[in-house]
Amino acid sequence: MAKKKKDEKQLNYKEEIRLLKSGGPARVYLLWGPEDYLRELYLQTLKELCVPEGEDGFSYKRMDGPELNLQELSDAIDALPFLTERSFVELRGVDLNRVKDGDALQKLLEDVPDYCTVAFVQSAAFEPDGRLKLIKFLKENTVELKFTEQTQDALVNWIAKRFAAHGKRVELEAAQHLIFVSGDLMNRLIPEIEKVAAYAKGDVVTVSDVDAVAHHLPEAVVFEMTDHLARREYNAAMEVLNELLSDKNNEPIAMLAVIGGQMRRLYAARLAAEKNLGASYVMEVCKLRYDSIASRLIASSRGFSLQQLKRAIELCAETDYQMKSSSSDDLELLKELMLRIAAGETHA
């Protein structure tokens, strides 16, 4: 399920590509963020502008981290381009938060010649430590781009194009549901789109096609489970829980954290519903990216009273304490928690 970090700025990918092509390559880039599919597309465009003939052994150099050899980098930067106007130095996975001599690296980057472009390409998990002098320098003196998850409209349009390439048309609701169950990162969605396109019998991809074969994130499965609880479909809710726990990768304590987060979001949505605050308020409070998810959350919250949701949050906290401080079986504790939530407890 797509959640948004506080005060996260959305990257306008098309605008960044336009600026790159119109203004030309800069000297130093810091490319990072979770949306690695768009990061690689941007990097490819940048490479093509710098070294149109491709990754030769003269104008193009690549260095892989996490360690960084400053002498090797200096030699690559100083090397004159051969049969091209520019040279391109690609640094992959260098741990910029732990560079041994940040001052020396900063000095080196300050003197990158106009004919050279240096690109630090970070993994999707990388998060720059803004307290460090080197990171501050990079943010203030280079082209720093954080490749964020895209807006719902942009992602839906992209999904539609991917399905069209398979000869399929996807319903809007099905595209939104795919984002909901499989997440909003493009590289994760590509194999799911391929699976769903291969499975769908007709020319139109529906929600049922997505549900049949797409990978469901634990957050989406828990959302489905609480939907069942809200509709008093207790057997269906327990079936979903058993399915979730049948995956050995889903540890009970990790699933408890997901369930606790969902109950807190439902409580916030129920409060918003009582005060007629709408989906935009729920999106802000619950850090949700898409209004379709917020609307579904509000609808589900109406199946519980505020007191039931408050008690459910308390039960999650109590279960967390028991898992961490007692010898009780975590799986049984989690099942007991869900039974008590399903029973609609309102008081201790």
Positions of the model-derived regions?
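Conserved beta/loop motifs at nucleotide-recognition and modification sites
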Residues: M1-A348
